[in-house]
Amino acid sequence: MNKLFFKIILSFLIFLSAVNANKIAVVTKVKGLVEIMPTGKKLFSKLKAGSILADGDKIRTGTSGFAAIIFIDDKSTLKLKGNSEAVITGQRTAASISKKINMDSGTIRATIKKQNSSFVIQTPTSVASVKGTDFWLLTDPDKGDQVIGLEGIVSLKNIDTGQDVDVVQGMSGISTPDGDIGVEETEASSIPTDPSDSNEGGPSQFKIYLEGPNGTQKVMVIEYQ
């Protein structure tokens, strides 16, 4: 998707968020099995690209699933790989959204624009806090967390001990359920592949799914090159 296309989408979403403040992000890509449990609901349903996410929505991916999400205030992105589960939350303050991702398990890439608001990913083991960076986070409730720094600095804190480390480009932070935390050089083989890095040429279309006041769903279709 080109930059002009994203500008059009984001302009529309910023307008939408002004009307409905709990709308915080839009799903830009879905591959394989990806499901959503909307905030206030108890059941999962299929997630489609173009869906608008609200504060508190829960997303999970199947073994080969993948989802890409862009926040409407600053174009920060999240990418969830297979076997991942996360709750997307955001609190609006003036022109920005303070974002927190509660992640139970899986693999996620976060590319965060420099901002005044906070961005936090919390797992059962750790808390990762950033302001403008690019990193992978792999979490397992039994084994703990690995944060792989691609750009900028990530502050990684172990919940059990309260100890923290800074993770920079080329380094990986390790945090375990028993309280151990440290930093080591990243092995190239440990960096996950990003499915969205592959180029997909040719004209296409993007659908945005909107819900009316009576619960009916409408679809806005945008053609792009």
Features from the language model and the residues they span:
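Active-site-proximal inter-transmembrane loops
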Residues: V127
